[in-house]
């Protein structure tokens, strides 16, 4: 008999591989979408033959009308989701397609939440607070990555208080996700590093979570191996399709893992840094990871010793504690190799803000 029971959440359909973006029009039509709001940013919208252009071409070919919202910001704000809601209602839209990285997906999810569950999203922060389904949602992913294209998390920033909060619900999971690595070949080095380290953290945290299970363990292990062997190359040579493909596989695995085994204090604290200083989420996560996990070693040293081996470190002859410390060293080295800043000072962190951020981190859905 199993020692415990657990739920396992996944999107119903995931398209993966070079060229799959061409299928989005037919899939949107199959879902009954007649006029989706395309949620993206100006940069992606302006790319010739980029993700947005290919999405729109496929929709046109399938006879699906659309309207475009192109004002997605990093660390999406409440004002962004309200803008999408307004466009949705005024244009007579019936669905949402997000095109971008985590910010686009969170903006689309946030808009969907307030379209059906009430206008004040701050009251919905927490776990499984949504009573009503979102409008039909498809996510086209362009970074590897937050995993937001297939998870139940919507992360929004209150621009007035600088508080970053999470709405966690199975209702947020997109009906369909698209991960086409050819759309990621021109992602800049800095963004590749930041999003890649976010994926790494999202594989590490569920592995040492109290909610881990055999399914999520296998996903975390493979994701960590893929990132350890592919992220450096993806940063150094963005047009290496094999490295990009492996990073997409890794971020999908990590996303499925933390969708079920959850995250932890790295993300709870990173949300506060990002909300307070509008700093890149992946950079915040990477900066905090080794220090939070060094603190956590005492809770499960054997899991961290396993992480060292998964990352390719030689633990022969080492005590469990020493092997666990080797995992922390390997985490720092990976961040160093891909150009992550060395200190939170470099993203503008100020000691006078620490107490408030600590209080808010304890209220975060990942704490």
Question: What are these language model-derived features?
Answer:
Residues 1-95, 344:
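ATP/NTP phosphate-donor binding region
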Residues 21-24, 47-49, 78-81, 103-110, ...:
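Short glycine/serine/threonine-rich phosphate/pyrophosphate-binding segments
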Residues 22, 116-212, 303-306, 310:
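A glycine/threonine-rich phosphate-anchoring loop and its flanking beta-alpha core
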Residues 39-40, 100, 157:
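Short beta-strand/turn micro-motifs composed of small residues
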Residues 88-128, 134-142, 269:
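A short, small-residue-rich loop immediately preceding and capping a beta-strand
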Residues 206-330:
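Active-site segments that bind and position negatively charged phosphate/pyrophosphate groups
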Residues 304, 314-367:
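C-terminal charged capping/lid subdomain of soluble metabolic enzymes
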């Amino acid at each position: 008999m199993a020692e415990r029971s657990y739920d396992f959440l996944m999107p119903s359909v995931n398209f993966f591989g070079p060229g799959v973006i061409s299928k989005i029009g037919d899939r949107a039509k199959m879902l009954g979408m007649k006029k989706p709001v395309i949620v993206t940013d100006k940069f992606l919208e302006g790319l010739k033959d980029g993700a947005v252009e290919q999405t729109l071409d496929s929709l046109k070919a399938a006879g699906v009308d659309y309207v475009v919202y192109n004002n997605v910001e990093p660390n999406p704000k409440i004002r962004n989701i309200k803008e999408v809601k307004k466009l949705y209602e005024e244009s007579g839209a019936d669905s949402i397609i997000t095109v971008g990285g985590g910010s686009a997906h969170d903006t689309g999810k946030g808009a969907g939440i307030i379209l059906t569950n009430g206008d004040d999203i701050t009251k919905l922060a927490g776990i499984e607070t949504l009573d009503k389904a979102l409008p039909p949602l498809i996510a086209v992913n362009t970074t590897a990555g937050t995993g937001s294209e297939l998870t139940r998390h919507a992360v929004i920033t209150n621009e007035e208080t600088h508080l970053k909060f999470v709405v966690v619900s199975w209702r947020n999971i997109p009906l369909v996700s698209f991960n086409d690595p050819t759309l990621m070949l021109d992602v800049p080095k800095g963004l590749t590093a930041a999003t890649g380290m976010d994926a790494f953290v999202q594989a590490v945290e569920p592995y040492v979570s109290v909610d881990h299970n055999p399914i999520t363990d296998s996903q975390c292990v493979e994701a960590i191996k893929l990132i350890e062997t592919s992220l450096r190359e993806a940063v150094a040579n963005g047009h290496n399709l094999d490295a990009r493909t492996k990073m997409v596989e890794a971020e999908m695995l990590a996303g499925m893992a933390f969708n079920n085994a959850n995250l932890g204090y790295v993300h709870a604290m990173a949300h506060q840094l990002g909300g307070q200083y509008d700093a890149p989420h992946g950079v915040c996560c990477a900066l905090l990871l080794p220090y939070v996990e060094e603190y956590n070693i005492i809770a499960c040293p054997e899991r961290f010793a396993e992480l060292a081996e998964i990352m390719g470190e030689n633990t022969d002859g080492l005590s469990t504690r020493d092997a666990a410390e080797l995992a922390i060293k390997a985490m720092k080295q990976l961040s160093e190799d891909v150009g992550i800043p060395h200190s939170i000072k470099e993203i503008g962190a100020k000691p006078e803000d620490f107490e408030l951020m600590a209080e808010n981190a304890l209220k975060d859905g990942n704490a």
